[in-house]
Amino acid sequence: MGFLWRTRSNEKKITPVLSWPESEPESEITIPPEFQCPISIDLMKDPVIISTGITYDRVSIETWINSGNKTCPVTNTVLTTFDQIPNHTIRKMIQGWCVEKGSPLIQRIPTPRVPLMPCEVYEISRKLSSATRRGDYEKCGVIIEKIKKLGDESEKNRKCVNENSVGWVLCDCFDKFSGDEKLTFMLNEILSLLTWMFPIGLEGISKLASATSFRCVAGLLKSTDDSVRQNAAFIMKEILSLDETRVHSFAVENGVAEALVKLIRDSVSSSSTKSSLIAIYQMVLQKPEIASEFLEIGLVSITVEMIVDAENSVCEKALAVLDAICETEHGREEVRKNALVMPLLVKKIAKVSELATRSSMSMILKLWKTGNTVAVEDAVRLGAFQKVLLVLQVGYGEETKEKATELLKMMNTQMKLMSDCVDSLKEFKYIKKPF
């Protein structure tokens, strides 16, 4: 049956409205004002006291504070501290009242979990660090499982864990045991935790970028388990963000290119596709010679097909990858061969995002500067001139506008050449042309 909830100013009356008329209506249930949260005017499930002495439901007051408010909603007094103390007395009274009413409309509120405190996180971190130094992987596994459970309980717990440097300790633990194939499950659990702990700092990423750690992440990237591959792709993206030659050499040695392209081709998830594209972009940007490896496994055609109907965040990353590929001669040749490229580049200008617009214009410029005037003619015929003019009129950054200006000059020159060519054909306008 369905119910409608009617709210009055100082108290809340719950009046069930039955979904079929033949049933007898139940009696009204009035929530006592002292059990209502002053913010939501709803029954408090986790009552807490703030510095002004007023009791609120924890979720409501946290939302209020996280929105930037620094005063008590009731008294309008500036809060001296944002600490929230559980009001056990009110909670027990509410629980007793729920049981006393014994109505299906009112369920007994469960005893809320005590929020995670920084001192607890510090102790967890200390124990994990100690077990890692001793090489006690069993103890590490127990602590890792505890961190996982805490993170699953609430977003607030995750925030507390992130703010107390657990990420670095987990990276150290991963590096310590990354060479042991028997501990693959535990190592993947660490990567799974790290996906919600970034940024973890340069020191932590450096631990993951060691030779043994990198080899382990690359191995997990080739797993048959999609969730494992997704975690590994996210971590690989972060490792490759390091501007270090050795890291990109590790990528070549461990067959990372093929694993990333396979992950994109398999369409495991939007997040894994984005992580893979960012990782590929970083690899090609830092080590252009690796582009040939990506070209051999069909990256251009896969990326172009993706751009056709991908969501904006994926589309802009795919365009950035193609732009990086066009830095090499072999890459430009492969891009020219694909008939879809130029129509897509023109279409995405001023449509997806500034990054996508800049990447599209950059690719057209690269193709023209290397002697491909046909590409520019195609761009002009497809309406690129008008779209690039639009780029100069909207609020894009200086770098984007500079590319737009350069591209306009180039297209203007090409349009004049095309116009002269058309004029020279006027003398043949009376010659009958076969269909």
Curated annotation (Swiss-Prot):
**Which pathway, per its entry?**
Protein modification; protein ubiquitination
Domain U-box intervals: 30-104
> Does the record bear Transferase in its keywords?
yes
Q: Which reaction does this enzyme catalyse, per its entry?
A: S-ubiquitinyl-[E2 ubiquitin-conjugating enzyme]-L-cysteine + [acceptor protein]-L-lysine = [E2 ubiquitin-conjugating enzyme]-L-cysteine + N(6)-ubiquitinyl-[acceptor protein]-L-lysine
Protein name in UniProt: U-box domain-containing protein 21
Q: Which CDD domains is this protein grouped with? A: RING-Ubox_PUB
**Alphabetical UniProt keywords:** Repeat, Transferase, Ubl conjugation pathway
Spell out the residue ranges that the record assigns to ARM repeats: 202-241, 245-285, 288-327, 329-369
Gene Ontology process terms (BP): protein ubiquitination
Instruction: Give start-end ranges for the coiled-coil region(s).
Output: none
UniProt xrefs under InterPro entries: ARM-like, ARM-type_fold, PUB22/23/24-like, RING-Ubox_PUB, Ubox_domain, Znf_RING/FYVE/PHD
- What is the purpose of this protein? Functions as an E3 ubiquitin ligase.
EC number(s) on file: 2.3.2.27
| Superkingdom in the source lineage | Eukaryota
PROSITE patterns for the chain: U_BOX
**GO molecular function annotations of the record:** ubiquitin protein ligase activity
